[in-house]
UniProtKB/Swiss-Prot annotation:
Taxonomic source organism: Caulobacter vibrioides (strain NA1000 / CB15N) (Caulobacter crescentus)
PROSITE patterns, per the entry: GATASE_TYPE_1, GMPS_ATP_PPASE
Protein name as annotated: GMP synthase [glutamine-hydrolyzing]
Pathway per the UniProt entry: Purine metabolism; GMP biosynthesis; GMP from XMP (L-Gln route): step 1/1
UniProt xrefs under PANTHER family: GMP SYNTHASE [GLUTAMINE-HYDROLYZING] (PTHR11922:SF2), GMP SYNTHASE-RELATED (PTHR11922)
Gene3D superfamilies with a match to the protein in the record: 3.30.300.10, 3.40.50.880, HUPs
EC number of this enzyme: 6.3.5.2
Gene Ontology cellular component annotations, sorted alphabetically: cytosol
Stretches assigned to coiled coil: none
UniProtKB keywords: ATP-binding, Glutamine amidotransferase, GMP biosynthesis, Ligase, Nucleotide-binding, Purine biosynthesis
Domain Glutamine amidotransferase type-1: 9-202
Amino acid sequence: MTQKTDHQRVLIVDFGSQVTQLIARRVREAGVYCEIHPFDKAEAIVDEYAPSAIILSGGPASVLEADSPRIGRKLFDLGLPLLAICYGQQLLCDVLSGKVEGGHAGEFGRAELTIGKDSPMFQGLAGVGGVETVWMSHGDRVTAIPEGFEVIGTSTGAPFAAIANDAKKIYALQFHPEVYHTVNGPAMYRNFLFNIAGLKGDWTMAAFRQEMVQKIRDQVGDGKVICGLSGGVDSSVAAVLIHEAIGDQLTCVFVDTGLLRKNEADQVVTLFRDHYNIPLVHVDAGDLFLGELAGVSDPETKRKTIGRLFIDVFDKEAAKIEGATFLAQGTLYPDVVESVSARGGPSAVIKSHHNVGGLPDYMKLKLVEPLRELFKDEVRALGVELGLAPAFVGRHPFPGPGLAIRIPGEITPEKVKVLQDADAIYLEEIRNAGLYDQIWQAFAVLLPVKTVGVMGDARTYENVLALRAVTSTDGMTADFFEFPWPVLGKTATRIINEVRGVNRVVYDVTSKPPGTIEWE
């Protein structure tokens, strides 16, 4: 289903690429609204969606396969500016009577694109004869281009690496300008959006805020809304936005599982009840959660237990709010996109999603999802627009099950206290060193391992604590953060001296893949 908006918008047709969302990110970063729709729905919704331009994504298939994802001529014949990427370029050539062949040496990784002709696609870049660093990932390649097209860029493995039909404003690239390895990829997208498609770039968080406040009022009317507040960025921004729209028709329910970071529950209550004056039900359920988790070591069982208990507690509190007919959720655009894959097939379950699930069907609450059009970075920008402190909206991601998945093995109140104290010291030292905003996520893990140590003149036998910090752009892949050694050294010394129960600190230098960011 498309979103109704008065903004100029771009339709991104998804053919199953793992980086389709990066295309949307690049378009949004340029201030242009866009949506991703699967290839088999694109022609049906294009009239309703009324895009100002179209982008065809890459994909893992081959246009030479009988069951490859395809579209007909309709999108090419609309007279709209169109940009085709990788598989999209090959499909364009196949549909418009060019030629695609397999069996050639593919290109995978960094490549050099030689610009062969002045083109609005490459305005402000290396110039004719100049070289741009791009990212290739293709096996098949175009060997003949459709009538009306000309070559504007070549590479060693792709003689038609960039082609154009200037009259029809249709451009096709064999490489991926959306990935950061393509050095001037963002500039290429801006060239397409502004120089070629003539868009204005009217997508801002200030405009979104104003429009969404009105949409919430129109949807809710005089109804009452319940919002499950976790203290995380998404639910917090959603709550503040909804409260701006409907005031005290919103009630937030904050379930303290006892598995939050140090002092986090108090901070949430202070911020929302005292600062924003949002009606807030604070449920201290720590004893319940820790009691149910006693003796549980399997990580999946932990997640499911926490999810079940959260729903039970939330359900009981929600039932006490008379007349509530709406449930607010902090659903983001990646959640919406991932629910409909281009190929329609299942993906392997690595582990249950961190965010605990929905409420029982019998509650029959209608959903209010004010953030469902936004990416995470846009949610943070909206939070600042709404007056939330940059330090709050810039906090690192925190999993729904909380510290439970940062304590491998059995969970006890004593272990939670040790981890809370150690984690707080770690994050404090990162902030003191001015490194917090350079890191995607940083946290401590209390291991189910004890080692021998010496403190004072006495032998100790206490816990090992692992420190984890990674850099990432989207959480899909991650590299370990390269700390200055003095920062790690000071952090380890403070933890061992100030947190009773830890006598050894180690640093995790595993990237993703092969590891995941969280340990469980």
